[in-house]
């Protein structure tokens, strides 16, 4: 939906079927400007000069979602504004009073239990002395192109009339598309379709007033092209009291019937149209606004079908009869009614009491909110008189349901069935996109806290500035500017146009201008955050509402109060300051204060009137609480937070007084300084005298640090020497390797060896057996052995001499304790007597013979076997389990037996250690050994 797509052209309706011959009727029919359902006029674009020659298709842009359909030739679809004639028919007056206020005040679509302020468009023509003046205005409309009687300050806060300063609707019949009110996403058809056709007849007045066909154009709710089912069914939001759509037949006023309304003919109030001089309803005047006293407001379901024009379809209900009203004001009021949408299930919850002061006044030339706040005693009195007459319904209403619509509405108003312009619509699927009707400059703020109890609110008089509590869903179809706070007129006007209209208004109706000047400001406050309907792409921000534009954001999360408006400004060409799609800035404090002041003034200035009194200002406690809560919630979060922080700061300061602690510079002395106090001067000692504990601690730490264990070196210590001496290790044979921190003690001979290996001779390597054979010889040798020993090869071997110095070892015999060294022989000690010089002491002859026998190349295996047999025989002798005492020992037999029973460990005396092998000698070798 482009903002500049929709251009509104003259919407002059075709001549009425039932009254086409009357020129005055046509003039009233063209009087779309005053009958505009949404004086809040959505300024989609700068309106072109009215052109009656253009076809109807020009009214709708190519991409506009509203259906295009031909003008309906049905008389009921057109508002027939008959010439005003003097008459005394009070019945007609009663009938007329019903649509005046009730239709405008009631917004029948409310889904989430949120109140939508009645959008009564009160086209009060203050500058007119009579309806003839109104005729003049209509006549001059085509040439004027702009209503002079509209003051820039005029606007409606309670959905009555949006500021009329901007060109709401030229007298030429040019109509701006009415804004669409969404109910929780449902596009409720207000009344004005983008094609300039207004269907007020199909809009049932929540107060029981008959549906109004505000403009003389065809009553086709094109704005509601989309069915209510397009959006999710928000019927769940319906309040406890469900409103059923019922057909309410209204009395038909025959042509020529005169409607006499007594009261101030010059009442400056827009809302309180106190005096309507004798008006003749030439067309059929049907009242469909029969309100049920039990909060069951029955409104016929209006289905605007583009293809079939206006089809008033009613689910299980009779079709509403369309009304023809003399007043554009009635039209504008009707537009504030429920957003009729296709397939809307239950449109209205309650019908507000029709306020009699909303009747079309002969002076009603200004569709502004100036009259909203005017609660003058004179006007109140006149409105009361009008109410008394209006509450006396003597209209020729054949339908019993439509009888005393005013009385029913008044009773409902008195009973609190209908709130101040608030009608909660339950299960209303009126959220068709097409509801551009009554695009009130003030979209009702979104109410959250008072949703459940809104039904208790009696709607205040239209003259009263009441915050518009409307559901966010209704705002979807209502293309109003969120930021047009004080300027509820959404029509695009240049500053010159505003000034011109204001001048004209001041000239024609100074009273209205005065009231507008007085009330426009608070209205702007009320408007703030309320005009953020989905549309009004071209609305120009008014200077008055600039201060409160920030609060008209899409979702002002700073204060989610009941008065918070759901602002859809994403599609506006000229987004006001802070009126962006998601401008979540805080509400200005001034706005909240103004809102609260307006509430106070509204609720205190206008007191509860009698049943006949046009003003029913009694608001239920829930509504008042909601209003106050909304005012408080409007306060910016930052200001409230700041105030709370300041209070908390004062409380903490009182509870915890701050104690001034002087900064003391303390010089920290080093540990060394503390420990060396004994060497410091006396003054230092005195200064540290009080620090005895600290000094004691450091002293203990110093003792640990200077412990002897940390200074002890194991190597070379006395204990180390004692240990080595006890182990019989010569310290000279110990080599200390590695670094100083981790010395490694290794034997001296293994210092340069990775592995202990036998020493090799430089000439010829000799095996261990050869070395043993060279040094060992047996005393008793067989000839073979002797021959072997005399072998030249054996003789060629040099004598084995162990070089102690080169090996790095110390000769144990040379050592001091050499005498104590053990004589380790493998097989036992060798008798010195049996040993000879030819043998090496410490080596057994059998072993020697065995080793040398292998060296003999000429010997046979027999000789080797014999040698081994000898060795084994020797082993048997020496390895006996009994110990043989030495010869020199003189022991008794008992001792000898005990010693013999002990294991023989004499092999440990052998100097050469060999692992014993268990060999069983052969019999031959055993025999030879025995021989």
From Swiss-Prot:
Example GO BP: intracellular transport
Residues spanned by motif WXXF motif 1: 28-31
Disulfide-bonded cysteines: none
Keyword Repeat applies: yes
Modified residues (Phosphothreonine): 613
Biased composition (Acidic residues): 19-29
Segments of skewed composition (Low complexity): 33-45, 618-631
Coiled-coil features, chain-numbered ranges: none
Biased composition (Basic and acidic residues): 516-530
Primary localisation category: cytoplasm
Motif (WXXF motif 3): 476-479
Swiss-Prot/TrEMBL keywords: Cytoplasm, Cytoplasmic vesicle, Phosphoprotein, Protein transport, Repeat, Transport
Region (Disordered): 1-49, 371-454, 494-561, 599-636
Motif (CLTCL1/Clathrin-binding): 712-714
Entry annotated with the keyword Cytoplasm: yes
Sequence segments annotated as region (Clathrin-binding): 821-825
Residues carrying Phosphoserine: 151, 395
Sequence motif WXXF motif 2, residues: 433-436
Bias kind Polar residues: ranges: 371-381, 439-454
Domain comment, as recorded: The WXXF motifs mediate binding of accessory proteins to the ear-domain of AP-1, GGAs and AP-2 through hydrophobic interactions. Selective binding to the GAE domains of AP-1 or to the alpha-ear domain of AP-2 is tuned by the acidic context surrounding the motif and the properties of the second residue of the motif itself.
Functional summary from the UniProt entry: Component of clathrin-coated vesicles. Component of the aftiphilin/p200/gamma-synergin complex, which plays roles in AP1G1/AP-1-mediated protein trafficking including the trafficking of transferrin from early to recycling endosomes, and the membrane trafficking of furin and the lysosomal enzyme cathepsin D between the trans-Golgi network (TGN) and endosomes.
Subunit: Self-associates. Interacts with GGA1 (via GAE domain). Interacts with GGA3 (via GAE domain), AP1G1 (via GAE domain) and AP1G2 (via GAE domain). Component of the aftiphilin/p200/gamma-synergin complex, at least composed of AFTPH/aftiphilin, HEATR5B/p200a and SYNRG/gamma-synergin, which plays a role in the AP1G1/AP-1-mediated protein trafficking from early to recycling endosomes. Within the complex interacts with HEATR5B/p200a and SYNRG/gamma-synergin; the interactions are direct.
Protein name in UniProt: Aftiphilin
Gene name in the database record: Aftph
């Amino acid at each position: 939906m482009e903002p500049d797509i929709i251009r509104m052209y003259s919407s002059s309706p075709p001549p009425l079927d039932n009254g086409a011959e009357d020129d005055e009727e046509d003039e009233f029919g063209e009087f779309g400007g005053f009958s505009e359902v949404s004086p809040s006029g959505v300024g989609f674009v700068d309106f072109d000069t009215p052109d009656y020659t253009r076809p109807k298709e020009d009214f709708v842009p190519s991409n506009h979602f509203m259906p295009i359909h031909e003008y309906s030739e049905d008389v009921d679809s057109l508002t027939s504004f008959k010439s005003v004639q003097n008459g005394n028919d009070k019945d007609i007056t009663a009938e007329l009073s019903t649509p005046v206020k009730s239709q405008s005040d009631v917004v029948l679509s409310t889904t989430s239990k949120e109140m939508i302020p009645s959008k009564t468009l009160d086209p009060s023509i203050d500058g007119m002395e009579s309806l003839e003046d109104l005729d003049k205005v209509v006549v001059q409309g085509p040439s004027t192109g702009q209503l002079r009687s509209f003051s820039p300050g005029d606007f409606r806060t309670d959905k009555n009339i949006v500021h009329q300063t901007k060109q709401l609707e030229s007298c030429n019949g040019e109509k701006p598309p009415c804004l669409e009110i969404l109910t929780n996403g449902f596009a409720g058809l207000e009344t004005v379709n983008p094609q300039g056709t207004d269907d007020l007849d199909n809009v049932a007045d929540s107060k029981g007033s008959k549906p109004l066909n505000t403009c003389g154009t065809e009553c086709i709710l094109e704005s509601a092209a989309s069915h209510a089912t397009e959006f999710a069914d928000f019927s769940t939001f319906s309040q406890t009291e469900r409103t059923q759509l019922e057909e309410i037949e209204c009395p038909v006023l025959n042509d020529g019937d005169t409607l006499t309304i007594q009261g101030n003919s010059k009442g400056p109030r827009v809302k309180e149209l106190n005096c309507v001089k004798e008006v003749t309803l030439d067309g059929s005047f049907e009242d469909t606004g029969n309100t049920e006293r039990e909060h069951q407001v029955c409104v016929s379901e209006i289905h605007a079908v583009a293809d079939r024009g206006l089809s008033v379809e009613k689910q299980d209900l009779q079709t509403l009869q369309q009304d023809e009203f003399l007043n554009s004001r009635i039209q504008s009021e009707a537009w504030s009614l429920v957003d009729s949408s296709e397939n809307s299930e239950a449109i209205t919850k309650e019908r507000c009491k029709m306020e009699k002061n909303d009747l079309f006044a002969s002076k009603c030339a200004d569709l502004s909110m100036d009259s909203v706040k005017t609660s003058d005693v004179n006007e109140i009195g006149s409105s009361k008189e009008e109410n008394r007459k209006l509450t006396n319904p003597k209209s020729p209403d054949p339908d019993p349901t439509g009888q005393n619509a005013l009385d029913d509405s008044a009773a409902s108003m008195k009973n609190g069935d209908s709130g101040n312009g608030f009608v909660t619509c339950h299960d209303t699927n009126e959220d068709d996109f097409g509801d551009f009707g009554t695009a009130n400059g003030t979209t009702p703020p979104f109410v959250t806290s008072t949703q459940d109890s809104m039904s208790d609110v009696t709607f205040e008089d239209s003259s009263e500035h009441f915050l518009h509590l409307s559901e966010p869903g209704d705002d979807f179809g209502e293309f109003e500017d969120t930021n047009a706070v004080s300027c509820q007129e959404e029509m695009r006007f240049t500053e010159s146009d505003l000034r011109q209209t204001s001048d004209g208004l001041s000239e024609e109706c100074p009273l209205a201008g005065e009231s507008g000047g007085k009330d426009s400001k608070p209205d702007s406050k009320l408007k703030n955050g309320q005009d953020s309907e989905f549309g009004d792409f071209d609305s120009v921000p008014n200077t008055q509402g600039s201060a409160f534009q920030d609060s008209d954001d899409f979702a002002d999360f700073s204060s989610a109060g009941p008065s918070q408006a759901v602002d859809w400004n994403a599609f506006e060409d000229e987004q006001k300051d802070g009126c962006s799609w998601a401008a979540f800035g805080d509400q200005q404090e001034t706005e909240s204060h103004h809102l609260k002041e307006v509430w106070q003034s509204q609720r205190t200035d206008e007191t509860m009137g009698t049943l006949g009194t046009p003003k029913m200002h009694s608001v239920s406690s829930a509504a008042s609480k909601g209003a106050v809560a909304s005012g408080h919630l409007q306060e910016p979060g930052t200001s409230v937070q700041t105030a709370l922080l300041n209070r908390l700061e004062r409380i903490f300061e009182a509870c915890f007084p701050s104690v001034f602690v002087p900064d003391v510079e303390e010089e920290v002395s080093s540990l060394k300084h503390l420990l060396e106090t004994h060497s410091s001067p006396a003054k230092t000692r005195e200064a540290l005298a009080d620090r005895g504990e600290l000094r004691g601690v450091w002293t203990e730490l110093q003792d640990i640090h200077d412990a002897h264990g940390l200074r002890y070196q194991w190597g070379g210590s006395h204990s180390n020497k004692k240990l080595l001496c006890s182990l019989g290790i010569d310290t000279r044979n110990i080599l200390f390797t590695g670094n100083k921190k981790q010395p490694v003690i290794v034997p001296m001979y293994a210092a340069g060896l990775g592995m202990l290996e036998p020493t090799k001779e430089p000439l010829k390597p000799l095996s261990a057996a050869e070395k043993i054979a060279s040094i060992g010889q047996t005393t008793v040798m067989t000839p073979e052995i002797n021959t072997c020993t005399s072998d030249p090869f054996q003789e060629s071997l040099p004598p084995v001499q162990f070089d102690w110095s080169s090996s790095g070892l110390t000769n144990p015999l040379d050592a001091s304790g050499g005498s104590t060294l053990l004589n380790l022989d493998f097989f036992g000690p060798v008798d010195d007597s049996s040993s000879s010089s030819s043998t090496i002491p410490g080596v057994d002859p059998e072993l020697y013979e065995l080793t040398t026998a292998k060296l003999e190349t000429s010997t046979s295996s027999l000789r080797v076997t014999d040698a081994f047999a000898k060795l084994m025989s020797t082993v048997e002798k020496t390895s006996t389990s009994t110990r043989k005492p030495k010869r020199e020992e003189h022991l008794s037999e008992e001792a000898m037996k005990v010693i013999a029973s002990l294991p023989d460990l004499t092999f440990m005396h052998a100097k050469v250690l060999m692992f014993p092998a268990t060999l069983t000698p052969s019999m031959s070798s055993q025999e030879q050994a025995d021989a």
